[in-house]
């Protein structure tokens, strides 16, 4: 999972993620927006979940982050899982609205994002 942090002309941090993980970048850009307290909450939840069967989720305005002891899922809130009813052409839409990754990989991005934000 590759990522890049940039600052736009106004100084706002933007995250770009590799293909298949774009939604994670959107979560940082739309939900985190340099709010390090939210990252603290996510890291605390990850520590609590490690080695357990429990899960945790944080619904935001545009995206929801869901996590268990092994995996992180970020999905667009407007994405409805219709199961077998999903049309064949909807896979591309689904990839633009849902990303999965391991907890450790996600926490590495969180730590790198925090470091980048603090380098003002």
Swiss-Prot record:
InterPro entries: UPF0231. Belongs to the UPF0231 family. NCBIfam families: PRK05248.1-1, PRK05248.1-3. This is UPF0231 protein YacL.
């Amino acid at each position: 999972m590759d990522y890049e942090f940039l600052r736009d002309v106004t100084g706002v941090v933007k995250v770009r993620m590799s293909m298949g993980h774009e939604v994670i970048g959107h979560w940082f850009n739309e939900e985190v927006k340099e709010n390090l307290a939210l990252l603290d909450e996510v890291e605390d939840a990850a520590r609590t979940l490690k080695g357990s069967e429990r899960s945790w989720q944080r619904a935001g305005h545009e995206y929801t982050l869901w996590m268990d002891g092994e995996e992180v899922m970020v999905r667009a809130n407007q994405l409805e899982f219709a199961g077998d009813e999903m049309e064949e052409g909807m896979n591309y839409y689904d990839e633009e609205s849902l990303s999965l990754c391991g907890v450790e990989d996600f926490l590495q991005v969180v730590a790198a994002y925090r470091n980048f934000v603090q380098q003002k």
